Amino acid sequence: MRAFLALEDGFVLEGRSFTGRGESGGEVIFNTGMTGYQEVLTDPSYAGQMVCMTYPLIGNYGVTAEDMESGKVHVEAFIVKECCRTPSNWRAIMSLPDYLAQHGVMGIEGIDTRALTRHLRINGAMRGIISTETDDRDELVRRARALPTMEGQNLVTRVAPATPYRWDGTRPQPVQLAADGAYAWPGTGPRLVVYDYGIKWNILRLLTDQGFDLLVVPPSFTAMQVAASGAEAVFLSNGPGDPATLTDEVREIRVMTERMPVAGICLGHQLLGHALGGTTHKLKFGHHGCNHPVKDLVTGHIEISSQNHGFCVDIESVPDVEITHVNLNDGTLEGFAHKTRPILAVQHHPEASPGPTDSRYFFARFRGMVREAVGR
């Protein structure tokens, strides 16, 4: 079915919908991963975005039950050069087109993804529309320009849970706190409150592997509630949108950083930066993919990392921290640790899913920091 992709600057490409009729809009970005499309689709950090995969053939291994990073598809639309309809994978439960159609998400193929990626790299990520409903290119460009920009958008409210839950190893399970806010921690490990701003499930798996006893909470959970729960440390997850909009969350994080160990990944890294007095800015086209080189300044090692962010903490803006990681492509901040308090964070994704596992030591580093701070 004939479909068009129109960007706000008037750049228009024609392709074919592989999920039926429809129209969708959002910020158009590109991802340089060769594999891992299922994890991309189910990553809540992609809310509000239409993702172009730079690799030319996507869908070869279908969709599996084991490779989800959340319970649904979060991208606004999926843009590929060619979509495979006959996957070859013994684990596959359905094809990529069927999966997107099941979740009501538009997919477009036949697009010159090299031309689109080059355009976005030169001109920056921008708003766009994909539609099968009209071939009026000027009208589609007008619709793209009417969409909200990513700056100023709080998208966490679209993907975060409303109530606390526990992680059973495969899926979230609801929990009930006592009237006074206390939580009956089921395990014997360090008691960790995990803020879910749009968390990827592999983060929960790896925190569990480190021996933490987890209570996962919504963004509205206050520092006072954290204390009442009996938590000993706090972890801030990834998530979508502009971190500068989350002023209430930053206020509560600031309180928690004065009381207990705190770590963050991606959006959590940005929120910690704000809580400690720093600022953030929007990157031209973001970092999206699983082949980004990062240098760990603590060890001197070079890591290939998985990344997905459109905003970045200004590298000189956060007081009283040691810069621990930098991006070797553009020199942007990839991680910091506080000089006197048990606080650390990274911008990239050490849990990967998809991507390399070079940075997975971050979870052990956090576990060691908590052990030193709380004595177990």
Swiss-Prot record:
Q: Which domain of life is it from?
A: Bacteria
> Which E.C. number(s) belong to this protein?
6.3.5.5
From the UniProt record, give one GO term of the biological process aspect: L-arginine biosynthetic process
Which pathway is this protein engaged in?
A: Amino-acid biosynthesis; L-arginine biosynthesis; carbamoyl phosphate from bicarbonate: step 1/1; Pyrimidine metabolism; UMP biosynthesis via de novo pathway; (S)-dihydroorotate from bicarbonate: step 1/3
Ranges for domain Glutamine amidotransferase type-1: 191-376
Q: Which reaction does it catalyse?
A: hydrogencarbonate + L-glutamine + 2 ATP + H2O = carbamoyl phosphate + L-glutamate + 2 ADP + phosphate + 2 H(+)
Please list the residues that make up the active site: 266, 349, 351
Q: Where is this region: CPSase?
A: 1-187
Q: Which family does it belong to?
A: Belongs to the CarA family.
Q: What is this protein called?
A: Carbamoyl phosphate synthase small chain
- Tell me which species this is from: Nitratidesulfovibrio vulgaris (strain DSM 19637 / Miyazaki F)
- Gene from which the chain derives: carA
